[in-house]
Amino acid sequence: MLVLGIESTCDETACAIVRDGKDILSNIVASQIDLHKEYGGVVPELACRRHIDLIIPVIDQALNQAKLTLEQIDLIAVANGPGLIGALLIGLNTAKALALALRKPFIGINHVEAHLYAAIMSHPQDFQFPCLGVVLSGGHTALVLIKQIGQYELIGQTVDDAVGEAFDKVAKMLNLPYPGGPEIENLARHGRSVKFNFKAGQVKGRPLDFSFSGLKTAVLYAIKDPKALKEMVLLSSEMTQDIAASFQEAACSDIVKKSLLAAKQYGVNTLLFGGGVTNNCYLRKLFSVANSNLNYIWPSAGLSLDNAAMIAGLGYYRYQLQNKSDSMDLEPLTRTPLQSVKE
């Protein structure tokens, strides 16, 4: 089955064509980083307008790269949430229009679930379920017990900022360019992670939940004069590196600790990672050092950030499970939990 996937949840306009869930024939991603960089983050209105400009050219590129026509596509898959409402509408309405015009089935895909599926696409060997899904991105931080593809139990999540959002906000405090994650990681390589005793937050009675807002505030107090928060302290390059290293250590070690605790509590040996923060080399090193006996499944570089291949790939399996097209009344959802496919 040939599946055309569309992704427009935030600031990437993407289209991909995947055969039978894993064979990627094309994977086109148009990034908006240059558009949003001067604002230090994504501006929803600008993102939406750029999606309108790019969606059709990106679909054409995906078809050309795969050497296929629209008539050869068997299924349309589209991310319908969670994400920015305006951005989601562009992708969803485009998918509906294609499905109607071509008289093909279409299916809505949960963006967070697709991030987890990206790791499966990156490693075509068979998996032993259940396993632990660890979602780490700019908009999401969650621990998910994966019983099978399409069968999930949310066991931990952030109660405030996502870890990727925290990286971006700390980078902005340090006057680093957007996106901040890679900038923090690069600076941290030269810093001393023990210089500042930063700690990620703990949620009372919920040991698998995350909280990064307090960590972010602690960094703010380290940067600014506590008695006059509007006045910036002039940071040396050495101090900037130390702050970056200490922040990264606190955030990553908290993720490792809670992920391994979840794996132990639920008796799983395989951890499946999804989201852009999984590109962080220090995070990967911490996991390997903390427990080298577990099986860590990381997404490949081309599938860790937002892309449409993961949407198309998961769309194939979701369609096999539910065995019917979604309704044309399917709506975009800014917030939507992982949902298991009903038997």
Curated annotation (Swiss-Prot):
Fe cation binds at H111, H115, D306. Binds 1 Fe(2+) ion per subunit. Belongs to the KAE1 / TsaD family. Its main location: cytoplasm. Required for the formation of a threonylcarbamoyl group on adenosine at position 37 (t(6)A37) in tRNAs that read codons beginning with adenine. Is involved in the transfer of the threonylcarbamoyl moiety of threonylcarbamoyl-AMP (TC-AMP) to the N6 group of A37, together with TsaE and TsaB. TsaD likely plays a direct catalytic role in this reaction. CDD domains: ASKHA_NBD_TsaD_bac. One of its GO terms (cellular component) is cytoplasm. This is tRNA N6-adenosine threonylcarbamoyltransferase. Keywords: Acyltransferase, Cytoplasm, Iron, Metal-binding, Transferase, tRNA processing. The keyword Iron applies. It is found in: Cytoplasm. It comes from the Bacteria. Substrate binds at V135, L136, S137, G138, G139, D168, G181, N280. GO terms for molecular function: iron ion binding; N(6)-L-threonylcarbamoyladenine synthase activity. Its cofactor is Fe(2+). InterPro entries: ATPase_NBD (IPR043129), Gcp-like_dom (IPR000905), KAE1/TsaD (IPR017861), Peptidase_M22_CS (IPR017860), TsaD (IPR022450). It catalyses: L-threonylcarbamoyladenylate + adenosine(37) in tRNA = N(6)-L-threonylcarbamoyladenosine(37) in tRNA + AMP + H(+). Its EC number is 2.3.1.234. GO terms for biological process: tRNA threonylcarbamoyladenosine modification.
